[in-house]
Amino acid sequence: MFEKTGQLPDKHLATAILSLLIFGWILSFSASLGHFDSYSYFYKQSVYILIGLALAFTCLKIPLYFYKKHAKWFFIFTLVFLTLVFLPEPIGRTVNGSTRWINFVFFKFQPSEMMKIAMILYMADFLVRQEKDVKKPWLGLIKTLIIISSAGILLLLEMDLGATIIISLTALIMLFAAGVYLVQLSVVGGSLISAVGIWLYIDGLSGGVRWQRLTQFWQTDLWINDSEKVYQTKQALIGIARGDWTGVGLGNGIQKYTKLPEPHTDMIFSIIGEETGIVGMLFVIFTFSFIMLKGFKIAKGALKQKRKYSSYVGFGICTWLSLQFSVNIAMNLGLIPPKGFPLPLISYGGSSMIFVLIALGILLRVDMETRCEYSKQKNYV
């Protein structure tokens, strides 16, 4: 299971990851001051980060062929976890109308975060094993739809539209990167969009909040819209405006004090803007962009060595994190309605933080295998 490559992790990439992690750790602590017992959330986030770093370090030791060998079972195992959330309490747990959590003794676990990695690992394996079949008009179409919809249906039943969109888009972009024909890709994408559209329509007919959130968000100008669905967005923009260039100082923001809902999770970018200003926001954007550009370069390097599985995994990880980061920023800037998209490496949250760090550990391992001696590379995928 464990195998040395003779290489150390890329120091520039590792430094960028740790820098953003520490910055997010400080800001997450500051953002939680207004609503909670700050020390409790500070300790919890510290534990999540330590667990995530320990698991990421473990992933540095595990060769990619281990994931390829067990990708199918990991995917099935995660699907089982997605079904467990529907069990009555104390196992399953519903929060704000969404059934997404499993209760363990000391913490809540969100299987949808695990599915983001499981889908990438399994889709990469599928694209390598079924390289010829996946490009056939009907056979490839049916197989890819089964894989994506098996997770998507469960996520929609959990009322987790955000995870459904991120996971489905990541899988579609991986298919595109693997050379799947645009006609097939269009059919798969169209089917998924239709399914989400029907789900939103049914949700609207049944009085659900998702359809209302979409329609009310864009029905009129944001600042004259008195709907409660845009209140969070308004408060986020007010916070960013208060920060100006250099911010009001760490811990000195006022939006987190009862005005801005979820300041430590989904809307933490607004707190970054208020307390550290445009300078802090640009630091986050440029640092994360550097990490992602390095990641895509790592995926390209693996592909040059004909290690398609490693390349697809690296590409999938970077696609997922880039999508989630971009959507969170757009949400905080009032471009799209608020939704449950944590900011990678920064937002408070156990499941999200741990699995993002695991994914980055796998990405660093891909790079280490690319740079190792040629004699060892024959064992890598």
Regions found by a protein language model. Give the residues of each.
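Short, small-residue-rich loop/turn micro-motifs
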Residues: S32, I240, D244, L333
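Flexible extramembrane loops and terminal tails that flank transmembrane helices
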Residues: M1-L13
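Extended hydrophobic-aromatic, low-complexity segments
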Residues: V248-G249, V279-V284, I354, V366
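Transmembrane helix boundary and interhelical junction motifs in multipass membrane proteins
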Residues: D160-I165, V248-G253, P263-T265, K339, ...
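Hydrophobic alpha-helical transmembrane segments of multi-pass inner membrane proteins, especially
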Residues: A14-L27, G34-E228, S270-M331, I358, ...
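A juxtamembrane structural motif centered on a specific transmembrane helix
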Residues: M1-E3, Y309, Q324-V381
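TM-adjacent membrane-interface loops and short helices in multi-pass inner/ER membrane proteins
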Residues: F217-T265, V279-G280
